[in-house]
Amino acid sequence: MRSAIGIDLGGTRIKALAYNLDTEEEIKRTMLPTEDGQFFDEDPAWANSIRELILEWETHFGQSVDSIGIASPGLTAKDQRSIAFMPGRLAGIEGLIWEDFLKTSAKVRIANDAHAALLGETWKGTAKGSENVILLTIGTGVGGAAISDGHLLRGHLGRAGHFGHISLNPWGNPDICGTPG
């Protein structure tokens, strides 16, 4: 059985899904609290929760998974192995190389959460078959993504289609990252 694990790392919750790539069926699903700001040994508690979950599921399946996709807020590094920029929350995420941290043989890729949501919608969701799509995510934060002519727009800095951190009132209270209004 070829299998994959998808993880949505949010500001308040971690959602995870194990998927059989051969039958295209869900195997298992769970949700955990993020516990941002808490640490276990020297590692963030949320990162340890993800590592323990993957080990538990691999033991349950009796084999290692083939690939792991992690959707996270923030800007991904160009090589899609880590989050390059995530100010204000999820302490310890910037620069964390997931393949090394998870100690797994699986292929691990990181994506901005809005990008991942949009790719999922065009793969299996309501935007399946669409060539031009815009998606707005609203959760602990606000994000967005766009596909034009069938291609995910990333932009030079990975921010294309990203709606977060738009100042509506330059004299307003700052958000968690310090942007006013």
Positions of predicted regions on the chain:
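Conserved phosphate-binding loops in N-terminal lobes of ATP-dependent enzymes
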Residues: 4-72
